[in-house]
């Protein structure tokens, strides 16, 4: 959609992200100095991210144990934020302590942050699939699956696995007049995902 606005209407769309607890803006997708010289495709890759932290907002990403993860655009973890405009508690104390020991608030999102500080949300913490100690983004997997020409809609859920705790199950709605099957969908996904991201099964539903 961003690409169509730029190419067809000469409209530049700037991505931003926030939440009520942040009053509300947390990031904005403003380019850094020199980025205007990048190619169109390189700029689109940046614009698809939620952007850099806004004034006086700090961000970090952590694993399940609270250990900070590197800003490399690849490792994704819990997104936490800190700043003077960010809520420190809910009304009447609902939810108890909502800040960690460094004063960071857990947004409930899963994200990556690249070397230049651009953040990209990949999932919600409650939706991410945890398989053998690794995280699989249900949203990213769904977005790739709907790229299959015979798939109209896709949803990914985690199902119990005795060894890996959870494994992804892909649920697809076939495109009108199409009859995809498990094998051709998995073949389509195979070179687009890490091997351990591949769903254990694919089921098809009418809607």
What are these regions (language model features)?
Residues 83, 88-89, 110-197, 203:
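AMP-binding/adenylate-forming catalytic core of the ANL superfamily
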Residues 44-53, 100-103:
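Short Gly/Pro-enriched turn/cap motifs at secondary-structure boundaries
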């Amino acid at each position: 959609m961003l690409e169509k606005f730029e190419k067809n209407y000469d409209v530049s769309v700037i991505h931003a992200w926030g939440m009520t607890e942040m009053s509300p803006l947390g990031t904005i997708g403003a380019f850094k100095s020199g980025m205007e010289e990048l190619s169109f495709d390189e700029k689109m890759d940046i614009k698809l991210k939620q952007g850099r932290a806004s004034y006086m907002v700090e961000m970090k990403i952590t694993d399940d144990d609270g250990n900070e993860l590197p800003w490399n655009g690849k490792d994704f973890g819990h997104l936490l934020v800190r700043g003077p405009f960010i809520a420190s508690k809910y009304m009447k104390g609902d939810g108890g302590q909502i800040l960690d020991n460094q004063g960071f608030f857990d947004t409930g999102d899963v994200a990556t942050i690249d070397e230049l500080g651009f953040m990209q949300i990949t999932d919600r913490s409650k939706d991410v699939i945890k398989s053998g100690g690794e995280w699989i983004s249900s949203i990213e997997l769904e977005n790739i699956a709907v790229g299959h020409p015979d798939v109209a809609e896709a949803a990914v859920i985690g199902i119990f696995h005795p060894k890996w705790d959870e494994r992804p199950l892909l649920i697809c709605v076939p495109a009108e007049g199409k009859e995809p099957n498990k094998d051709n969908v998995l073949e389509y996904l195979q070179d687009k995902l890490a091997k351990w991201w591949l769903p254990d099964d694919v089921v098809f539903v009418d809607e």
